[in-house]
């Protein structure tokens, strides 16, 4: 699918200048397993809030379905975009270790305030409702700020426990991303079963308080493993990576009128090296920076530019991805959720099937499919990251088509006024396919943005991965607002009417399926021409 760039050292590898390599006493699976447990505790906390957020907004806070969905998407988008700032601070100034500690502290404070806000008596007066909403949204966005530093750094910190220059550890690193996803999904599955039940049947304050304790445990466990990690808090004699890359663009712009011959004469050796690499055949305008910049710096700039088409074409997938915690949940709430007399399945619990399918499929993928594919492809990960991402995007389109068909059937049953509503179990296949899709695309995007950026920018690389989901959530929120306004005119019911039996979520799902197909076609075109930055990139 893509050409491989064979010179790993010029862009840097896991053994970067500010990692402390003590291979016999630190790092490896010993440290990586602890990082997985640390993030499992954090994921329990985050999804203990996020999974049922729309039900809290439409319930105790009294928002409409469309407003609540827009608020959830806006917050989720902010959670996904703030890592760009957190990654920048980590890679440029603080380092990943310090950033994780500081952001975890903010995270814990936000969760504590969130739980406190639910204890404020509501509906007693306008002032008390306003106070509750103010504290609630302030704490919610404080959690987002904590996530902004935590999320890009913890995954990179875990992957950095493996040396990419060692063949065995490079394979272990690829496996690490699979098992990190596995652990996260077990944790998310647990919190969706436990927290959502507590929130809807016992107490919202208790349901939001338990995630606070879980995040406190996450920070404690992370600090417990300090002596076993491969890391250093100091940068060793390297310029700010953002300054290096910015300088390449500035020099290329300054020299844009210089003839090629003058550039070659100015630095003949660097120019010959540039021409020797397949990756340098792309973005040749940056070669004009060779007058005053080093080859490695120019290649770093090109590596960053190559990410942009993949980032853009992956956004449609994340728009589709944004529907499972919002409209899928509201869709399930209108269906027959009884499993025994007096016992209802919380609608948000259905999201557990996404995680359950990942938990079931990842061991099969990592232990059976990868070795089988490796025997044919000779790729240490079985298939390339772009092939993995593309498989997941295709499956997400299939899930959305299935969701549209099920919603059409549900609406027909509701409008026929059947005495027994359609069973909620009809939604399970779309959740399962979404889970398998996430296993391919989410892990693939993590590996891709970790491996294809310069080593000193890996926190930012992971943040770029997360920002795709932010863009998807913001665009989803924008689409919902526009479609709601358009379809609510002239006395017509909105596609997102509060009474979903009179709404048309099926039309929205079909629209997303069409957009997904168009985005997938563009993705295939860019992926086919992509040039990998390293030979050992997953």
Curated annotation (Swiss-Prot):
InterPro entries per the UniProt record, alphabetical: MFS_trans_sf, NRT1/PTR, POT_fam, PTR2_symporter_CS
Pfam families: PTR2 (PF00854)
Gene3D superfamilies recorded: MFS general substrate transporter like domains
Gene giving rise to this polypeptide: NPF5.11
Tissues expressing this chain: Expressed in shoots and roots.
PROSITE patterns cross-referenced by the UniProt entry: PTR2_1 (PS01022)
Residues where Phosphothreonine is found: 99
Family: Belongs to the major facilitator superfamily. Proton-dependent oligopeptide transporter (POT/PTR) (TC 2.A.17) family.
PANTHER family: OLIGOPEPTIDE TRANSPORTER-RELATED
Chain segments annotated as transmembrane: 44-64, 74-94, 100-120, 134-154, 175-194, 204-224, 308-328, 342-362, 389-409, 424-444, 463-483, 507-527
Record membrane topology: Multi-pass membrane protein
Any one GO CC term of the record: plant-type vacuole membrane
Coiled coil: none
Highest classification ranks of the organism: Eukaryota, Viridiplantae, Streptophyta, Embryophyta, Tracheophyta
Keyword set, alphabetical order: Membrane, Phosphoprotein, Transmembrane, Transmembrane helix, Transport
Record's signal peptide: none
The keyword Membrane is annotated on this UniProt entry: yes
Compartments (UniProt record): Membrane
GO MF annotation, one: dipeptide transmembrane transporter activity
UniProt protein name: Protein NRT1/ PTR FAMILY 5.11
A Gene Ontology biological process term: nitrate transmembrane transport
